[in-house]
Amino acid sequence: FVNQHLCGSHLVEALYLVCGERGFFYTPKAXXEAEDPQVGEVELGGGPGLGGLQPLALAGPQQXXGIVEQCCTGICSLYQLENYCN
């Protein structure tokens, strides 16, 4: 894994890879985005207690920018992605 731009589904796939069963969270940029079911929830794969849609946490790590600004607009590393794991 090298530092790279990760946007959209590529960012989600990278978070699944890095976080695994721990899951992950992010801070939506606007409240309207958090109300969108496709933005505010993520479908978790099988496993005890993880089935179905689970709401994402609305609080992220204490950083100047959110994950999209950090990893899509900018370039992020594996270690930066780990900051968003539960």
Swiss-Prot record:
UniProt-listed Gene3D superfamilies: Insulin-like
CDD domains: IlGF_insulin_like
Keywords: Carbohydrate metabolism, Disulfide bond, Glucose metabolism, Hormone, Secreted
Location in or out of the cell: Secreted
Listed GO biological process terms: cellular response to oxygen-containing compound; glucose homeostasis; glucose metabolic process; positive regulation of protein secretion
Propeptide stretches in the record: 33-63
Cysteines joined through disulfide linkages: C7-C72, C19-C85, C71-C76
GO molecular function, one term: hormone activity
Annotated Gene Ontology cellular component terms: extracellular space
Family: Belongs to the insulin family.
Subunit record text: Heterodimer of a B chain and an A chain linked by two disulfide bonds.
Function: Insulin decreases blood glucose concentration. It increases cell permeability to monosaccharides, amino acids and fatty acids. It accelerates glycolysis, the pentose phosphate cycle, and glycogen synthesis in liver.
Protein name, entry field: Insulin
Biological source species: Equus caballus
